[in-house]
């Protein structure tokens, strides 16, 4: 429940930030235009992002004939989660990782790298795919699409304000110093909120995945393995498309500096600790 409340508050925050910047550029009209612009971008992302992401990673759809064990695992977990069967994809990459995409549970897809199938045991793989199906069940793909779109739009509007200035409610030019401050600080604030939402949704997917599989310990050991192996194996497709990093079960990017604030994922140690506590107590709340 805490993660859902936190997500709602952060979503409200990023929406407010977006509208305020629109207002600084052009008063009420600016806010209206900004909101309509965000809605248009969200609509496009909502309907087409899954196809774009799968194409970026050259993901190949599989079925019960081409990947029988993996496909049956996903089907069994989808049944346990009371979800429609998603499309199942494999990505020919050594880096161990997985993600879910799709605009809703009826149009969902899950994908895993060939590397993760080699690294994890069957029980651990069940934990990972249960985590991805929890994202589908919680409609996190929609949430991440909205936040990523709005964070990008905030940056674009802030740059517009810096280079072209803004207008107040009466049409007078806005304070240029305020415009520069907005251009510098608003994109950072938007990114911070976006990352915080992503981390909250990862915690919630860990909890939901543990409920679906009934085995939080296996997800914990899977995260530990993925973290250790991924550190030494570059994920080239993810490095080429860093905006998709938040979709993965483990952050595939290798960067430093202010990592906790700008990371799309919580610290692996904290995720493991929470899952082990679930395993110890048998409670998933």
UniProtKB/Swiss-Prot annotation:
GO molecular function: metalloendopeptidase activity; zinc ion binding
Active site: 132
UniProt: Zn(2+) binding residues: 131, 135, 202
Membrane topology: Multi-pass membrane protein
Cofactor binding note: Binds 1 zinc ion per subunit.
CDD domains to which the protein is assigned, alphabetical: M48B_HtpX_like (cd07336)
Required cofactor(s): Zn(2+)
HAMAP family assigned: Pept_M48_protease_HtpX
Protein's UniProt name: Protease HtpX homolog
Lineage summary: Bacteria, Pseudomonadati, Pseudomonadota, Betaproteobacteria, Burkholderiales
